[in-house]
Design a protein with these regions (language model features):
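Active-site-proximal, Lys/Arg-enriched surface segment
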Residues: 1-90, 195, 199-203
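An internal, acidic/charged active-site-proximal segment
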Residues: 95-203
Length: 203
């Protein structure tokens, strides 16, 4: 359904980097018999009060077409993916241990992060088929995708750019002569931002 959009819009992305914005969105529902519908945070809630809404959750991706390079308009976002990623329904109180075990395994395989990883692989494959095998796919998302699952399975010739908490604990890989996997020195994005020893460029 979305492949023709990607194929035709790729001609307007002459640079080596091809940007794709990824985010999850919600669709309100009122029927209680919809299996995939569940109560979730209402994004329109005021900051001082959390509201819940019954609805479906979708994962969407939009190709960022840099028209500002050739025309007087800004970047345009064209939809290239829209798929449902509602969560697995929790078993009831009378569920057996086997049902609870199956639920825990299903949650690990069918969640927002796993859906993002599979979608990223599909987008990389479709970009190659559209003639963009020499381009770098840049996936941009919010903090929902700043986790080990998403960073651990980035497709080849792809980059993941996400927003991180300013107090997140980060570290580099340990040196090759160490038995550790992660380095001992830790830092946060806020410390990097305030580091006077780093030169920042405004683009």
């Amino acid at each position: 359904m979305f492949r023709p959009i990607l194929k035709r819009a790729l001609a307007y992305c002459p640079q080596r980097l091809v940007g794709v914005a990824v985010d999850d969105t919600r669709l309100r529902k009122t029927g209680r018999s919809i299996p995939q519908a569940f109560y979730q945070r209402d994004p329109l809630s005021p900051p001082f009060h959390l509201n819940l809404m019954l609805g479906l959750r979708f994962l969407q991706a939009s190709l960022l077409v840099p028209l500002h390079h050739t025309t007087s308009v800004g970047t345009r976002a064209l939809p290239i993916r829209f798929q449902e990623v509602s969560r697995i329904k929790r078993p009831g109180k009378k569920a057996t241990e086997e049902m609870k075990k199956q639920y825990r395994e299903a949650v690990k395989q069918r969640n927002l992060s796993r859906s993002f990883v599979e979608m990223a692989k599909q987008l990389r494959q479709e970009l190659d088929q559209a003639g963009g095998s020499d381009k770098i796919l840049v996936l941009a998302g919010d903090g929902s995708f700043c986790n080990r699952t998403c960073f651990g399975e980035i497709p080849e010739r792809s980059v993941l750019l996400v927003r991180a908490r300013k107090d997140a604990k980060l570290c580099f890989r340990a040196s090759t002569d160490s038995r550790r996997f992660y380095g001992v020195d830790k830092f946060t994005p806020e410390q990097v931002r305030k580091d006077d020893g780093r030169n920042w460029k405004t683009t």
